[in-house]
């Protein structure tokens, strides 16, 4: 069976080189075109889906809608869940990446961005931009809502959604599309493929390009490739 991952199209803060994380930003025109191209590729290759999973962030939701519209499948059920959100970049969210490197040093910022188990500084829960003050997370216990994450923590919160929603859907015979974010998809790919903690640091998923993971009937990894 096949599972298709798509990272959201190029966003406004991708274009501005800002740390985004859980901040809710829109797609750029480039991002919209990337999503349209992805949908057309899926249509041309004959990919049909029974259900789509995405995050609760606008850039992923819009990408999912565009992909499904272009592939003539906008009618299928979509499940939105915070566990597919991007990695939470803590106090770095909204900061310019280059300026942050100049302030803290390239090495420190590299550790925050690329280390598997070291998180950036926490975002104050009282900050106006904190997820604690966003009603889309109102039903999540406050001690579960992150203030900063590394990739390890991103996997730990995404994995229950894989086990409770995505994997059962696939095992029941449903054809699944997941439209999410660079780090939430990298985290799930690490689990599915069996990528080591060291190797995952160099595993990148480009914006708007369908990544196909081939699995056997027990969801064991076989191979992966881009369309």
Swiss-Prot record:
List the residue(s) that the UniProt entry marks as the site Transition state stabilizer: 181
Checking HAMAP family in the record gives: PGAM_GpmA
Residues holding substrate: 7-14, 20-21, 59, 86-89, 97, 113-114, 182-183
> Could you tell me what this protein does?
Catalyzes the interconversion of 2-phosphoglycerate and 3-phosphoglycerate.
What's the family? Belongs to the phosphoglycerate mutase family. BPG-dependent PGAM subfamily.
User: Which top-rank group of organisms is this from?
Assistant: Bacteria
Its gene name is gpmA
So where's the catalytic machinery, residue-wise?
8 (tele-phosphohistidine intermediate), 86 (proton donor/acceptor)
State its Enzyme Commission number(s).
Answer: 5.4.2.11
Q: Which UniProt keywords apply?
A: Gluconeogenesis, Glycolysis, Isomerase
Q: Care to name a GO molecular-function term for this sequence? A: phosphoglycerate mutase activity
Give the protein name, as stated in the record: 2,3-bisphosphoglycerate-dependent phosphoglycerate mutase
Task: Tell me which NCBIfam families the record gives.
Answer: pgm_1, PRK14115.1, PRK14118.1
Q: In which pathway does it act?
A: Carbohydrate degradation; glycolysis; pyruvate from D-glyceraldehyde 3-phosphate: step 3/5
What are the GO BP annotations of this UniProt entry?
gluconeogenesis; glycolytic process
Q: Which reaction does it catalyse?
A: (2R)-2-phosphoglycerate = (2R)-3-phosphoglycerate
Coiled-coil intervals, chain numbering? none
The answer to whether the entry has keyword Protein biosynthesis is no
Q: How does it assemble?
A: Homodimer.
Any Pfam family matching the protein: His_Phos_1
Query: Taxonomic lineage of this organism?
Result: Bacteria, Pseudomonadati, Pseudomonadota, Gammaproteobacteria, Pasteurellales
Keyword Isomerase tagged: yes
Which InterPro entries does the UniProt record give?
Answer: His_Pase_superF_clade-1, His_PPase_superfam, Phosphogly_mut1
């Amino acid at each position: 069976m096949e599972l298709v991952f798509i990272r959201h199209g190029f966003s406004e803060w991708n274009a501005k080189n800002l740390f985004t994380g859980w901040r809710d930003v829109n797609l750029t025109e480039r991002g919209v075109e990337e999503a349209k191209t992805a949908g057309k590729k899926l249509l041309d290759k004959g990919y049909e889906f029974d259900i789509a999973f995405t995050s609760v962030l606008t850039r992923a939701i819009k990408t999912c809608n565009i992909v499904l519209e272009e592939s003539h499948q906008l009618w299928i059920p979509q499940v939105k869940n915070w566990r597919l959100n991007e990695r939470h970049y803590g106090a770095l969210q909204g900061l310019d990446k280059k300026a942050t490197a100049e302030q803290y040093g390239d090495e420190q910022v590299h550790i925050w961005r690329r280390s598997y188990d070291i998180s950036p500084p926490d975002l104050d829960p009282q900050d106006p931009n904190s997820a604690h003050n966003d009603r889309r997370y109102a039903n999540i216990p406050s001690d579960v809502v992150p203030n900063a994450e590394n990739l390890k923590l991103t996997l730990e919160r995404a994995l229950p959604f894989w086990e409770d929603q995505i994997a059962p859907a696939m095992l029941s015979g449903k054809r699944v599309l997941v439209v999410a974010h660079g780090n939430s998809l990298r985290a799930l790919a690490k689990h599915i493929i069996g990528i080591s903690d060291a190797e995952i640091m160099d595993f990148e998923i480009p914006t708007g390009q369908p990544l196909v993971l081939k699995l056997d009937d027990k969801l064991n990894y076989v191979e992966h490739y881009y369309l």
